[in-house]
């Protein structure tokens, strides 16, 4: 079978591998659509394991079922989560599934940029979701990234009327925009240095878009009646953006850190100011089964219309081109690889 083999961000090759064989409780998924995630381009992290097949935003059709699989059959349209929890550890039992060691070590094989994917029994049991005909394979690739966004906003308990500043208008920032709108947030303002991203944010309904090179704090106060933001969501990994978040949050407000930085980056927090002003800093990583299920329901109900975010549709044979487009980030939001 054909796979997209990652060597580095500028070298992703179409190669041949043996089609995986499945065992009891497993399924073989024929990939129909697979999204390129921004984390796929975190070269400092990925290159340590290269060469490898990436891709974790996957939907497809079941090609084979292993012995003992009862809830799924050949031909079913499904989304499959790459990370699934044990549901028995102290983290899972307190609702913190994304801290589970099992979740951090599970995966499917070889990765989403392949014609066929072996889904282990644990992922079949806890991470496989049937797609109704009303949800396309393309929309199915958004379940995982939307679930991550949903978990983040659930963690900070976003409320009606809250002002929100989203730092970074790439795919995660725009998903935060769409979800915050559906959750009843008040003014939503967004920043970026990419004019294409800013224009997309404006088209999708952001109250204001601000070039990150300009006076973000001044522009924020001008739009938000002199106030800073109740919730600041960091969706860009530059250390300058995190420092901007410290300046942009209103008293008793919250900063949601949704993006990693390069290794070794540190953040200097004015502790006394944050203590006096009761500022909360919260991080959010990944998604759990509940988040995936809720994301699917939002897509089924068309409450979050993700099709507007797809800028490029490419075949598996164009995987290298897809990574190039994402890395350059000139006029792209979401690149979908199709079989």
Across the structure, where does each feature detected by a protein language model lie?
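Glycine-rich beta-strand-centered segment in the early N-terminal region that forms part
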Residues: 20-34, 45-90, 132-134
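Glycine-rich cofactor phosphate-binding loops and adjacent beta1-alpha1 units
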Residues: 156, 199, 204-280
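C-terminal hydrophobic helical "lid"/dimerization subdomain
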Residues: 3, 243-247, 289-339
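Local beta-strand N-terminus motif with an aromatic residue
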Residues: 75, 161, 206, 228-229, ...
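NAD(P)H dinucleotide-binding glycine-rich loop of Rossmann-like/cofactor-binding domains
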Residues: 86-167
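Short Gly/Pro-enriched turn/cap motifs at secondary-structure boundaries
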Residues: 7, 18-19, 49-55, 105-111, ...
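Mid-domain Rossmann-like dinucleotide-binding core that forms the NAD(H)/NADP(H) cofactor-binding site
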Residues: 135-214
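Residue-level marker of beta-strand positions
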Residues: 57-59, 77, 91, 116, ...
